[in-house]
């Protein structure tokens, strides 16, 4: 029996699930017909509190797969916790994560192992996933995967545009060389991904503060990238996402909450742009916005706004208590900013270079933040004042009143000196 072997597997495939027994059965069925010897990989099903026949489905594969099962109480949508629980139970040096409903090709395990083999450094492998388009699932997909096994489905429609991995245009643009991407972490989607277990735990695994649908995988990708762990794409370790019911509006709402968590945990421009672009449309181009902010930074370099900041500070009423002031578009180019007594300054600018000198100051009353002001990590009404300078003119042409709206969210007073005629 596959489950009785003492041979250490080469790969652990972790599948989180919740009340989708039929879909899980289909995913496990494709893993049971891999070309790789069954003793060389194991499957770990991590149950997020199912009340259907999920446990019975897992038991039905005990004579066909090396399979483990872990259950956690249903305390709401906790897929990050479920994946971590599955990873803790895994015994292989490599982890793969598949979503319930992903139908793996027969050489999936073999291809994952091949992608991680050789003298190349340990890396994250993004496996392709055909058919995934939560915005607009294609009507032919259901009948296709019902009628044919995965490899035959790919043979029949593998070149059809509607069947492609949604990320294909992004991958093609860099000839599948993710080292040419500024933000490869944006495409770290755990419907099909693999990485060394040591690297997974080195960065802390999934952040279990992320509950609800969406974003927890991209945030992990962000941390992996920040730790210098390279990412690559494998077109060979593919799967097909079987169509299933989705609560799209609820998912989008949940995703935005998690994007907000992302910004609070990693307060810098790129997570901020991820929040802003996702808020406009779930699969917008963050890279396009990054390049636009680079251009605006180039145009504004050398622009001094110290007089505008002084005008804004003059609007503060006298106070015996410390007052917090944030500046959107602080610039400064390293010139000194000396806040008045009892004022704590938070200097925000989308050009990280102009903040460098301020960061070297030994001044507890001044802190620098590589943020534009589209979405900040602070709670509502955290500041007494936000000053928006003319360095924001370029971004405001594209983003309109978004900066003013965010300023009013976090502060009781907002001043834009360049619009006052002072």
From Swiss-Prot:
<dbReference type="Pfam" id="PF00535">
    <property type="entry name" value="Glycos_transf_2"/>
</dbReference>
<keyword id="KW-0464">Manganese</keyword>
<dbReference type="GO" id="GO:0017000">
    <property type="term" value="P:antibiotic biosynthetic process"/>
</dbReference>
<dbReference type="InterPro" id="IPR001173">
    <property type="entry name" value="Glyco_trans_2-like"/>
</dbReference>
<comment type="function">
    <text>Involved in the biosynthesis of the antifungal agent validamycin A. Catalyzes the final attachment of glucose from UDP-alpha-D-glucose to validoxylamine A to yield validamycin A. UDP-glucose is the most efficient glycosyl donor, whereas GDP-glucose and ADP-glucose are much less efficient. ValG also utilizes UDP-galactose as substrate to produce the new validamycin analog, 4''-epi-validamycin A.</text>
</comment>
<protein>
    <recommendedName>
        <fullName>Validoxylamine A glucosyltransferase</fullName>
        <ecNumber>2.4.1.338</ecNumber>
    </recommendedName>
</protein>
<dbReference type="InterPro" id="IPR027791">
    <property type="entry name" value="Galactosyl_T_C"/>
</dbReference>
<dbReference type="InterPro" id="IPR050834">
    <property type="entry name" value="Glycosyltransf_2"/>
</dbReference>
<comment type="similarity">
    <text>Belongs to the glycosyltransferase 2 family.</text>
</comment>
<dbReference type="InterPro" id="IPR029044">
    <property type="entry name" value="Nucleotide-diphossugar_trans"/>
</dbReference>
<dbReference type="Pfam" id="PF02709">
    <property type="entry name" value="Glyco_transf_7C"/>
</dbReference>
<keyword id="KW-0045">Antibiotic biosynthesis</keyword>
<keyword id="KW-0479">Metal-binding</keyword>
<dbReference type="GO" id="GO:0016740">
    <property type="term" value="F:transferase activity"/>
</dbReference>
<dbReference type="GO" id="GO:0046872">
    <property type="term" value="F:metal ion binding"/>
</dbReference>
<keyword id="KW-0808">Transferase</keyword>
């Amino acid at each position: 029996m596959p489950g009785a072997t003492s041979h250490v597997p080469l790969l652990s495939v972790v599948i989180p699930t919740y009340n989708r027994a039929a879909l899980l059965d289909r995913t496990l069925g494709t893993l049971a017909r891999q070309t790789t010897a069954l003793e060389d990989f194991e499957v770990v099903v991590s149950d997020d509190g199912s009340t259907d026949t999920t446990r019975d489905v897992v038991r039905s594969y005990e004579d066909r797969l090396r399979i483990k099962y872990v259950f956690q109480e249903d305390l709401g949508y906790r897929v990050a916790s479920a994946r971590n629980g599955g990873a803790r139970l895994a015994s292989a040096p490599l982890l793969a994560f598949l979503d319930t409903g992903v139908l793996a090709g027969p050489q999936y395990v073999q291809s994952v192992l091949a992608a991680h083999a050789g003298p190349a450094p340990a890396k994250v492998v993004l496996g392709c996933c055909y058919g995934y388009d939560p915005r607009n699932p294609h009507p032919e997909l259901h009948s296709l995967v019902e009628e044919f096994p995965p490899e035959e489905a790919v043979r029949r429609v593998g070149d059809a545009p509607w069947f492609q991995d949604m990320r294909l245009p992004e991958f093609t643009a860099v000839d599948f060389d993710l080292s040419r991407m500024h933000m490869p972490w944006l495409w770290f989607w755990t419907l099909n991904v693999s990485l060394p277990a040591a690297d997974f735990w080195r960065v802390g695994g999934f952040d279990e503060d992320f509950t609800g649908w969406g974003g927890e995988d991209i945030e992990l990708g962000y941390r992996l990238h920040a730790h210098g762990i390279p990412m690559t794409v494998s077109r060979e370790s593919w799967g097909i996402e079987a169509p299933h019911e989705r609560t799209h509006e609820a998912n989008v709402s949940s995703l935005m909450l998690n994007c907000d968590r992302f910004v609070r945990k990693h307060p810098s421009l790129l997570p901020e742009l991820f929040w802003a672009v996702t808020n406009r449309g779930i699969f917008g181009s963050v890279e396009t916005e990054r390049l636009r902010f680079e251009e605006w930074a180039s145009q504004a370099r050398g622009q001094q706004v110290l007089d505008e900041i002084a005008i804004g500070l003059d609007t503060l009423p006298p106070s015996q208590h410390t007052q917090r002031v944030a500046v959107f578009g602080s610039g400064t180019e390293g010139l000194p900013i000396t806040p008045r007594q009892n004022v704590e300054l938070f200097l925000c600018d989308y050009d990280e270079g102009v903040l460098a000198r301020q960061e070297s100051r030994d001044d507890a009353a001044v802190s620098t933040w590589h943020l534009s002001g589209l979405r900040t990590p602070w709670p509502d009404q955290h500041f007494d004042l936000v000053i928006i300078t003319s360095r924001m003119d370029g971004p405001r042409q594209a983003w309109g009143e978004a900066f003013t709206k965010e300023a009013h969210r976090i502060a009781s007073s907002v001043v834009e000196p360049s619009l006052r005629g002072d």
